[in-house]
């Protein structure tokens, strides 16, 4: 018999925060007999998943990429958001070699600089201040033709909140005396991550060919027209602003999203040789720059190269001869693999992965259970087989259904999670295994904006639950953060903590 319980399952309930407020709280409204029993029976507490505790600016809500990086690294990982913001403040951004090389080449040839990005203050995939800085950089370096192709948010921000961001950029271009917003579309089209190429195709043709479904004299007018059509920010259809603009050979294109997962598909359409996901009417040869590295396989320079993380949990388990399973449905598969492994695509030795397809629905309020039951089937099977020392699972429901803003669907999502967690803990009891239950950030515990009365579709800064489900006597240390979770797993496995992991165990065995 092994010295420590096996398997140890880390259950990450994506978007499942804790709030004492019952109003518009899908967790409070749901029937959760399993969650209630676990909290009544086992050591539990709350840990932080936002702000500087996860390497983000103070007061910045956490997100799935950041959360999983911290969970897997066992140390606070200073995020690309923070790196870029600091570089702008310090002035280093304006000396960035990758961006300047592309811009200077375009300027020397009398060509345009196109800026792509999610125009919002959400801070999850991008930040509007970074886009302003990019416009300033292009103007400083002599670009006369500067075009912003703005993707609208409404997901990490309220559903109809884009106008102040548009006005901020209009004012920035006016101040610079050059540049303008050339197109608008919702992130639903430009930032897909599930191979829904028909959406990406519309965004690509809008940017490259100036082919929009609608045209407006100004970006604000284009936005208002979309609202009148019943479209919120996320779903704004392809709209050209003023005289339509095309991307030409020799232009520079800088994609200002710092988060990789929703920037990859559109980037591939621009730069991938032999791209075949849809027919490109034109494929201009441009100087394309990614703000960060969206994937090692994408043939384009990154302004901010990835910072290597060593001895992350997956790597350290492999070094110690332990086996691990990573499992999630499509929406969160990258998080439980690439991001949890510190930005590494390949599995470690002894690591196996299971990808369960996410349901093919337009929005997940239409199927709030998503693929959680199928994910759970595979986990229960893995527990019963006792093939793995560690199982790491992400359940997407709280986040993905929370993002829809549909309260009744969010309640159903929480109830689905409760059932699934019950099945896992029951299977673990039969084999003597243990579990840690936590989340990466909040979302589903706040489904309405108290100030505006609109649906609250964004993440929150609320703490997240942490439960140790095991037979060993233990207490929970207060003041924990996501970076403390990996050291906690090592403690429960009886493994020493590597020096690179600066987090501290949350579960103190008695």
From Swiss-Prot:
Named cofactor requirement(s): Mn(2+)
Pfam families: iPGM_N, Metalloenzyme
Pathway(s) annotated for this protein in UniProt: Carbohydrate degradation; glycolysis; pyruvate from D-glyceraldehyde 3-phosphate: step 3/5
SUPFAM superfamilies given in the database record: 2,3-Bisphosphoglycerate-independent phosphoglycerate mutase, substrate-binding domain, Alkaline phosphatase-like
Catalysed reaction equations from the record: (2R)-2-phosphoglycerate = (2R)-3-phosphoglycerate
Binding site for Mn(2+) 1: 399, 403, 459
Cofactor note as given: Binds 2 manganese ions per subunit.
Record flagged with keyword Transmembrane helix: no
GO biological process: glucose catabolic process; glycolytic process
Gene3D superfamilies per UniProt: Alkaline Phosphatase, subunit A, BPG-independent phosphoglycerate mutase, domain B
Binding annotation for Mn(2+) 2: 14, 64, 440-441
Keywords, comma-separated and alphabetical: Glycolysis, Isomerase, Manganese, Metal-binding
Domain of life assignment: Bacteria
NCBIfam families hit by this protein: pgm_bpd_ind
Family: Belongs to the BPG-independent phosphoglycerate mutase family.
Record's function text: Catalyzes the interconversion of 2-phosphoglycerate and 3-phosphoglycerate.
HAMAP family on file: GpmI
UniProt name for this protein: 2,3-bisphosphoglycerate-independent phosphoglycerate mutase
Native organism: Ectopseudomonas mendocina (strain ymp) (Pseudomonas mendocina)
């Amino acid at each position: 018999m092994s010295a420590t319980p096996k398997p140890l399952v880390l259950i990450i309930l994506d978007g499942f925060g804790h709030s004492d407020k019952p109003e518009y709280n899908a967790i409070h409204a749901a029937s959760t007999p399993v969650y209630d029993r676990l909290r009544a029976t086992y050591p539990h507490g709350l840990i932080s998943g936002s702000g500087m505790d996860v390497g983000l600016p103070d007061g910045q809500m956490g997100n799935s990429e950041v959360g999983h990086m911290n969970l897997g690294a066992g140390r606070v990982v200073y995020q690309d958001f923070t790196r870029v913001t600091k570089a702008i403040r310090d002035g280093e951004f304006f000396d960035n070699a990758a961006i300047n090389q592309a811009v200077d080449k375009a300027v020397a040839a009398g060509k345009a600089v196109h800026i792509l990005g999610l125009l919002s203050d959400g801070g999850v995939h991008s930040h509007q201040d970074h886009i302003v800085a990019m416009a300033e950089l292009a103007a400083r370096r002599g670009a006369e033709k500067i075009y912003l192709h703005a993707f609208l948010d409404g997901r990490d921000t309220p559903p109809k909140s884009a106008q102040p961001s548009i006005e901020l950029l209009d004012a920035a271009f006016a101040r610079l005396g050059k540049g303008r917003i050339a197109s608008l579309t919702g992130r639903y089209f430009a930032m897909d991550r599930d191979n829904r190429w028909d959406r990406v195709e519309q965004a690509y043709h809008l940017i490259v060919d100036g082919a929009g479904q609608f045209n407006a004299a100004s970006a604000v007018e284009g936005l208002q027209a979309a609202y009148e059509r019943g479209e919120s920010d996320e779903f704004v259809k392809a709209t050209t602003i003023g005289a339509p603009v095309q991307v030409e050979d020799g232009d520079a294109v800088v994609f200002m999203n710092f988060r990789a997962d929703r920037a990859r598909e559109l980037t591939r359409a621009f730069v991938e040789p032999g791209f075949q996901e849809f027919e490109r009417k034109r494929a201009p040869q441009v100087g394309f720059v990614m703000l960060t590295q969206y994937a090692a396989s994408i043939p384009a320079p990154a302004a901010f190269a990835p910072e290597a993380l060593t001895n992350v949990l997956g790597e350290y388990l492999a070094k110690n001869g332990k086996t691990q399973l990573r499992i999630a449905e499509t929406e969160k598969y990258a998080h439980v693999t690439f991001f949890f492994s510190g930005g590494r695509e390949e599995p470690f030795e002894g690591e196996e992965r299971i990808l369960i397809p996410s349901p093919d629905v337009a929005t997940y309020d239409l199927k709030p259970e998503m693929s959680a039951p199928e994910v759970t089937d595979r986990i229960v099977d893995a527990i019963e087989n006792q093939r793995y020392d560690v199982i790491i699972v992400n359940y997407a429901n709280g986040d993905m259904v929370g993002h829809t803003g549909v309260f009744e669907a969010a309640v159903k999502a929480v109830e689905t999670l409760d059932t699934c967690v019950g099945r896992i803990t029951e299977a673990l009891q039969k084999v003597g295994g243990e579990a840690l239950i936590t989340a990466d950030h909040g979302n589903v515990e706040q489904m309405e904006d108290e100030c505006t009365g609109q649906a609250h579709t964004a993440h929150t800064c609320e703490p997240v639950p942490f439960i140790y489900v095991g037979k060993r006597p233990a207490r929970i240390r207060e003041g924990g953060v996501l970076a403390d979770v990996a050291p906690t797993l090592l403690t429960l496995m009886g493994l020493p903590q590597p020096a690179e992991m600066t987090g501290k165990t949350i579960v103190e065995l008695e």
